[in-house]
């Protein structure tokens, strides 16, 4: 089974009053992909009440309940029914010690982490902490039309080799727009994709997502 994570970011099309309408476009699929959506933090409570899909946060903190103004406690996520989160996205980068503390807490609480990295060196650094997913997204390709599977296939292969023999699944993001991009990524050893604008800002989000996950 492969994994497709759709990051809704804070795109107006899928946020706030538009979140429920956006999600109503989709139905669970029977196929080779598990679908996971990542709404904005302000929409997580609504997401938790939507039983059709699994939802991950876009960011989470290791700090517990308490005097932590502005933080997003992992414990609170779990109590809300959210079972995982993206971490260290290029639009929300974190210090390495913060990432390590968060990974350690997530491991104890059985909370899934999708750790974003920008290069193979960064991927290798976090190997010993065994994130559930490692998502390779070079910053310069995010939101563009050039797929990482075309521009930097050798780095995908390097990261797959780094995590060979572990329980970590490698995802590929940045510029993923077509089924061929997905097939090429999987051919390089990836176990799924992390996408955003190619689905959320599409004129037909359902069609765009289906075109990515209908492997032949």
Swiss-Prot record:
Question: Which pathway does this chain act in?
Answer: Carbohydrate biosynthesis; gluconeogenesis; Carbohydrate degradation; glycolysis; D-glyceraldehyde 3-phosphate from glycerone phosphate: step 1/1
State where the protein is found: Cytoplasm
The record's Gene Ontology cellular component field reads:
cytoplasm
**UniProt-listed Enzyme Commission number(s):** 5.3.1.1
Q: Where does substrate bind?
A: 7-9, 142, 175, 196-197
Its recorded reaction(s) are: D-glyceraldehyde 3-phosphate = dihydroxyacetone phosphate
The UniProt entry lists the main location of this chain as: cytoplasm
GO terms (molecular function) for this protein are: triose-phosphate isomerase activity
Name of the top EC class for this enzyme: isomerase
Gene3D superfamilies for the chain: Aldolase class I (3.20.20.70)
Q: Write the record's keywords in alphabetical order, separated by commas.
A: Cytoplasm, Gluconeogenesis, Glycolysis, Isomerase
The entry's active site is: 89, 137
| Classification via Pfam families | TIM
For the biological process aspect of GO, one term held by this record is:
gluconeogenesis
Give the family, as the similarity comment puts it: Belongs to the triosephosphate isomerase family.
Query: What is said about its interaction partners and assembly?
Result: Homotetramer; dimer of dimers.
NCBIfam families according to UniProt: PRK04302.1
Task performed by this protein: Involved in the gluconeogenesis. Catalyzes stereospecifically the conversion of dihydroxyacetone phosphate (DHAP) to D-glyceraldehyde-3-phosphate (G3P).
Protein name according to UniProt: Triosephosphate isomerase
């Amino acid at each position: 089974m492969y994994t497709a994570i759709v990051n809704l970011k804070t795109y107006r099309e899928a946020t706030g009053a538009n979140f429920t309408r956006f999600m109503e476009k989709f139905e669970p699929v029977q196929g080779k992909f598990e679908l996971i959506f990542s709404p904005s933090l302000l929409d997580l409570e609504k997401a938790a009440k939507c039983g059709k899909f699994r939802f991950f946060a876009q960011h989470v903190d290791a700090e517990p309940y308490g005097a932590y103004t502005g933080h997003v406690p992992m414990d609170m996520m779990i109590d809300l029914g959210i079972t995982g989160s993206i971490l260290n996205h290029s639009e929300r980068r974190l210090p390495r010690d913060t990432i390590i503390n968060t990974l350690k807490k997530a491991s104890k609480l059985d909370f899934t982490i999708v750790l974003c990295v920008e290069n193979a060196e960064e991927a290798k650094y976090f190997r010993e902490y065994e994130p559930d997913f490692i998502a390779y997204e070079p910053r310069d390709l995010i939101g563009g039309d050039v797929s990482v599977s075309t521009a930097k296939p050798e780095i995908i292969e390097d990261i797959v080799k780094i995590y060979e023999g572990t329980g970590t699944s490698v995802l590929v993001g940045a510029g993923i727009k077509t089924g061929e991009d997905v097939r090429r990524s999987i051919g390089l050893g990836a176990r799924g994709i992390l996408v955003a604008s190619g689905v959320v800002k599409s004129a037909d989000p359902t069609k765009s997502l289906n075109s990515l996950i209908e492997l032949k």
